[in-house]
Amino acid sequence: MPFQFTGFADEAEKTLAGQISTLKEVGWSAIELRLIDGKNVCDQTPEEWEQTFGTLQGEGIQVVGFGGQIGNWARPVTTDFQVDLDEIRRVAPRMRQANCKFLRIMSYPNDADSPLSQEAWKTEVVKRLKELCVIAEGEGIVLAHENCNGYGDNPEGYLELVEEVGSTALQLIMDTGNNSLHDNDIEVTWRYYEICREQITHVHVKCAKPGPDGGDHVTCHVDEDPVQERIFKHLEATGYDGWLSIEPHIKAAIHAGKDVDDSGEGRTVWVEFARRLESLVSKI
């Protein structure tokens, strides 16, 4: 099996202990951190982080990535940039401590209420990413841009950013479901993947299929979305041996304010998603 497995276990359990036990239930020993007890790991106090890291070390759990908030769906291009500068400076030392290189970012959605022109939007995004990349290079971390909200939500936009920013610290997280859900078409995801394959440093696994009424696409399991197997086969054929990090969004979707509840259903779905992913990949 060429790939390694991890995931956002905050979609299974709220507490760190619960997230760790979920990982162990599926036999995994690595996590991509985001929410712990409802708080983003990047916002933890020094004391909270030391407790988090100590627990992870004690349980033998590797930290693969930090699910950061820089440039994300809640921080449009008009947001005070100091918020993002504070985040990267706060979290970079913690990433080094955890021997973790991936800080997930996005690329600043335009302001819905007072949108900038296309050119002004691009200029401001590039300016911000350049400054963030200088910091990232100095800290030895990767700003892993997810194909989600922002200027780089399409392949052409992302490649424009790569060219303009000109930093090895800016690399791509390919989420295998975001574009399908945004555009109600799995072929849009394949197109993003195909155009940007050489940029990919990390993979988030999310899946989509048409809704029961034939309307908007909804999240689903990997074996219900044919673009997943196509992507995994091509990744293997082209030498990718990194992480597949699951972010099912079936029972929890952080961006939509849909946090995991206490029913246990989120964990059940997460575990099933993990096992069905392993089963699919084992047949490639």
Which sequence ranges carry the predicted segments?
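Histidine-acidic metal/acid-base catalytic patches
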Residues: 1-9, 13-29, 53, 85, ...
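N-terminal small/glycine-rich loop or linker at the start of catalytic domains
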Residues: 1-6, 64-75, 107-112
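Acidic/polar N-terminal loop/beta-strand segments that form early-domain functional surfaces
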Residues: 8-10, 34-36, 68-69
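Active-site acidic/histidine proton-transfer and metal-coordination neighborhood
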Residues: 13-21, 58, 74-172, 181, ...
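Short beta-strand segments at enzyme active-site cores
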Residues: 32-33, 64-68, 101-108, 143-147, ...
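Glycine-rich, proline-tolerant flexible connector loops at the mouths of alpha/beta enzymes
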Residues: 32-57, 108-113, 117
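Feature marks short, surface-exposed loop/turn motifs that line or immediately flank catalytic pockets
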Residues: 37-39, 70-74, 109-111, 151, ...
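Catalytic-core regions built around general acid/base machinery
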Residues: 48-58, 125-135, 195, 230-234
